[in-house]
Amino acid sequence: MPPSTDSSRRNSEEGFSDGFKLDSSALNKPPEEVFDIVGKLGEGSYGSVHKAIHKESGHVLAIKKVPVDTDLQEIIKEISIMQQCKSKYVVKYYGSYFKNSDLWIVMEYCGAGSISDIMRARRKPLSEKEISAVLRDTLKGLQYLHDLKKIHRDIKAGNILLNTDGIAKLADFGVAGQLTDTMAKRNTVIGTPFWMAPEVIEEIGYDTKADIWSLGITAIEMAEGRPPYSDIHPMRAIFMIPTKPPPTFKKPEEWSSEFNDFIRCCLIKKPEERKTALRLCEHTFIENAPGCDVLQAMILDAQEKVLLGQAPVAVAGADATLLSEGMSTMIDGGDATLVQYKDNYVTAQSLRSQMESLKIGGEIPKSAYGSSRNNGSPRVQPPGHTASACDPSNNPPFAEEGTGPNFQIGTSESSYKDASYNMMNTEAEYENRFQRAVCDGDFEFLRNITLDELIRRKESLDSEMEEEIRELQRRYKTKRQPILDVIEIKKRLN
């Protein structure tokens, strides 16, 4: 394990252990003999998440059920990263089971849900004090991860969970990455579009500083109810983030100078000039953050609104997770994560070795050995399989950009519109349906739209295309001009 500072280790591990663990005998039993599933918490990018009770101890847990034929090697990577993390600011991993065609991942249960759930339940963004308290815990979690040379790569309000003690924890390591000594920076496009750092989008290589940019966007999301650019199509946002100045508050004067400065420190275009998580923990805005009691009061307010029927969420008990209609709790599914995966082939022997080290019980399902449903996703090869020159694993690691089943771009998270904070973003829903239609060729839904609306959308589409062309031309000239200048200089010298 890479070394980390003593202070960060103390900050991350103080009060961490909850005393619960799964022993080898429990891992060797069928999961239904060990747990009672008591309710569904939500749907995520890899599968569904459920609330469960450990039969022997009564301990409340969260279980993520993942179809094995989706992306097994990526799930193994997620488990590996979770298992290595021992911080009270990172969701704890206890063990996993194979059950039929699913992998059950047993994790710490966070009874108050995500920050996104809280905002939806209260139908309003967070206050400045609430935001600073959430950011303090999140920064401690990021400091811990970054000390271990790990990048989360998907920081957003939907991936910050709260327990009922008012402690914020980082969750969803499905796209997290490890920085090794031989790979100082990654260059894969991965994350959620609106929260992506410019260097991630441009694929020029990135490191832990990418998480800091995403944290700054998340701070704006918590303050305004939605991230910057969420009112436009994600593809346009991906184009604009690297070319436009760093985003700021819509009304900076409504927030303290300390908060404005914190956002500025996070959202610096050049990653080398961005502060680290450790340095941001020393920022005045974070140092003056209130205690957990502020977040406990926020959670209580959200739960009261649920119980009074003032929020579009379901509640299953005093410590129930806040559930939004059509939205996930453990993993926010409303704003899909953009991922490019390698087509890794894994032998059953290597997978079994990983399973043993990661506390995974049960037998590898047959579906893990590849099927027509894999559609190019990483899969496991049966025992005895050896790589050959014709193996796809020997081909270039990524498909052409924007192609393949793992290229996912979703619409923005349910937005808060006007004073009423409408929970349905009709523009986003239209764009979502339109993008699906582009893929499957079924544009039948357009028949239900009025002529005036169709004309309006066509005119809007034309203007958007013209603006994107102008942006592309400006970007092209910016790249082309230095080359022309150097050519001219060389001609003069000759």
Curated annotation (Swiss-Prot):
Question: Where is the site Cleavage?
Answer: D332, G333
What the entry lists under Gene3D superfamilies is as follows: p53-like tetramerisation domain, Transferase(Phosphotransferase) domain 1
**GO biological process: any one?**
muscle cell development
Alphabetical keyword list: ATP-binding, Kinase, Nucleotide-binding, Serine/threonine-protein kinase, Transferase
InterPro entries per the UniProt record, alphabetical: Kinase-like_dom_sf, Mst1_2_SARAH_domain, p53_tetramer_sf, Prot_kinase_dom, Protein_kinase_ATP_BS, SARAH_dom, STE20/SPS1-PAK
Bias (Polar residues) ranges: 369-378
Q: Which residues form the SARAH domain?
A: 443-490
According to its UniProt record, the EC number is: 2.7.11.1
Catalytic activity from the UniProt record: L-seryl-[protein] + ATP = O-phospho-L-seryl-[protein] + ADP + H(+); L-threonyl-[protein] + ATP = O-phospho-L-threonyl-[protein] + ADP + H(+)
One MF term in GO for this entry?
protein serine kinase activity
Q: Sorted alphabetically, which CDD domains does this protein's record hold?
A: SARAH_MST_Hpo, STKc_MST1_2
Q: Does the keyword Magnesium apply?
A: no
Q: Where is the active site?
A: D154 (proton acceptor)
Q: Which GO terms describe its cellular component?
A: cytoplasm
Q: Which residues bind ATP?
A: L41, G42, E43, G44, S45, Y46, G47, S48, V49, K64
Annotated region described as Disordered, given as residue ranges: 1-27, 364-413
The entry's comment on post-translational modification says: Proteolytically cleaved by caspase-3 during apoptosis which results in kinase activation.
Q: Where is the Protein kinase domain?
A: 35-286
Class of the enzyme per the UniProt entry, highest EC level: transferase
Q: Which cofactor does it need?
A: Mg(2+)
Assigned protein family = Belongs to the protein kinase superfamily. STE Ser/Thr protein kinase family. STE20 subfamily.
The task this protein performs is described as: Serine/threonine-protein kinase which extends lifespan and delays tissue aging, probably by activating daf-16.
What is the protein's name according to its record? Serine/threonine-protein kinase cst-1
Species of the source: Caenorhabditis briggsae
The lineage, from the top, is:
Eukaryota, Metazoa, Ecdysozoa, Nematoda, Chromadorea
